[in-house]
């Protein structure tokens, strides 16, 4: 199942769940169920946003967007993180209010409905778990995992309420537990999204190690002006200047460039690289690099 369909299935499951949670939350006077409903309502919007982003990112590059729309999924992930933060505040405010004004809770209804919500959220999480590492899908998956954990917290609180009906404070406390889970998710997604948008070096890429890898390629004497960043969760880009040993022909320089691309593609996941190739200086006091035979330096190799 492709990502678009995974998101659509999860969207449908959660839309139906929100209606049920609101209806039974009001009937049972449960802030836990209403908090769960609020979280799921935000998730419906978040899943819709993720679905639109996936569809948008599939569009081919154009003259206006030469790299395509890969950043759309990152923007969706960032938007989801903001939505998560917003719903967290609302849940905390409501829970604090109910702690000061406890209401009787129909724990039996809460147990049944929250258990059903746990099953639905768990199923939605399994649908979204494509193990791709895509930030947009990760954000959507975290929404579902958070929902499942939130439903579990509500179930536990309701079971305790069945055994101790006077412990009405447990219901709003379960809502605060939900809020804590949601906030934790938001921080991780927000941090990763901002890192991509700021074109930070991917966290698993060591620039010194990458420089050594490139430097070990036959024909490469020096590496400088090295940059690595991400267009999306799955597309990494590199640009670098390489000083080649000796005075290679244009064809020989191109072969070195291709060998470098092969060396970095697999281990570092770099799908798009631009290499500017330079010659060694003929003498230490030379200001300009030597000219390659049959070519004007510098030679740029552009690779998709």
Model-assigned labels for residue ranges:
Residues 8-24, 123:
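First transmembrane helix
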């Amino acid at each position: 199942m492709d990502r678009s369909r995974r998101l659509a299935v999860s969207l449908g499951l959660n839309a139906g769940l929100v209606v049920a949670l609101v209806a039974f939350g009001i009937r049972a006077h449960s802030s836990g169920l209403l908090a769960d409903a609020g979280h799921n309502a935000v998730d419906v919007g978040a899943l819709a946003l993720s679905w639109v982003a996936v569809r948008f990112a599939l569009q081919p590059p154009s003259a206006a967007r030469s790299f395509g729309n890969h950043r759309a999924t990152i923007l969706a992930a960032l938007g989801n993180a903001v939505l998560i933060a917003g719903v967290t505040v609302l849940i905390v405010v409501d829970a604090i209010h109910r702690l000061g004004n406890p209401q009787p809770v129909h724990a039996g209804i809460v147990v049944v409905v929250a258990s059903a919500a746990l099953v639905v959220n768990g199923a939605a999480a399994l649908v979204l778990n494509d193990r791709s590492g895509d930030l947009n899908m990760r954000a959507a998956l975290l929404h579902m995992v958070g929902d499942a954990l939130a439903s579990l917290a509500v179930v536990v609180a309701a079971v305790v309420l069945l055994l101790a009906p006077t412990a009405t404070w447990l219901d709003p406390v379960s809502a605060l537990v939900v809020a804590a889970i949601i906030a934790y998710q938001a921080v991780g997604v927000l941090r990763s999204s901002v890192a991509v948008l700021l074109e930070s070096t991917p966290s698993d890429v060591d620039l010194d190690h990458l420089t050594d890898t490139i430097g070990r390629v036959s024909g490469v004497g020096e590496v400088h002006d090295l940059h690595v960043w991400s267009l999306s969760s799955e597309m990494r880009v590199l640009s670098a200047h390489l000083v080649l040993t000796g005075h290679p022909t244009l064809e020989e320089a191109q072969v070195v460039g291709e060998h470098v691309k092969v060396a970095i593609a697999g281990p570092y996941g770099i799908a798009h690289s631009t290499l500017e190739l330079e010659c060694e200086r003929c003498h230490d006091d030379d200001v300009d690099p030597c000219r390659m035979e049959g070519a004007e330096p510098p030679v740029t190799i552009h690779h998709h």
